[in-house]
């Protein structure tokens, strides 16, 4: 399963490590993805989603009901 946030749709990025001599080696920047369970009061059930820390902050700000309707459905 790819590391993609279900709310923000962010993916991991590719970049380069640079040494002191400016030699470039490829690097993958991974996301802070976690599984999190939320309770939906309208549907009276729990949902489990893969979400980044920024997505959790969005849910705390706007509420799970609004985010669920806008991004997940």
Curated annotation (Swiss-Prot):
Q: Name one GO biological process term.
A: translation
**GO MF term (any one):** structural constituent of ribosome
SUPFAM superfamilies registered for this protein in UniProt: L28p-like (SSF143800)
For this record, an example GO cellular component is: ribosome
Which Gene3D superfamilies does this chain map to? Answer: Ribosomal protein L28/L24
Q: Which UniProt keywords apply?
A: Ribonucleoprotein, Ribosomal protein
Q: Which domain of life is it from?
A: Bacteria
Record flagged with keyword Ribonucleoprotein: yes
Q: Which InterPro entries match?
A: Ribosomal_bL28, Ribosomal_bL28/bL31-like_sf, Ribosomal_bL28_bact-type, Ribosomal_bL28_sf
Key word Transmembrane helix present = no
A Pfam family recorded for this sequence: Ribosomal_L28
**NCBIfam families listed in its UniProt record:** L28
Family affiliation: Belongs to the bacterial ribosomal protein bL28 family.
Listed name of the protein:
Large ribosomal subunit protein bL28
**Provenance organism:** Buchnera aphidicola subsp. Cinara cedri (strain Cc)
Q: Could you tell me the gene encoding this protein?
A: rpmB
């Amino acid at each position: 399963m790819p590391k993609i946030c279900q709310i923000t749709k962010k993916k991991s990025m590719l970049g380069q490590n640079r040494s002191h001599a400016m030699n470039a080696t490829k690097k993958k920047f991974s996301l802070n993805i976690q599984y999190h369970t939320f309770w939906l009061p309208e549907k009276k059930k729990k949902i489990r989603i893969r979400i980044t820390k920024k997505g959790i902050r969005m849910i705390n700000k706007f509420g799970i009901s609004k985010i669920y309707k806008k991004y997940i459905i």
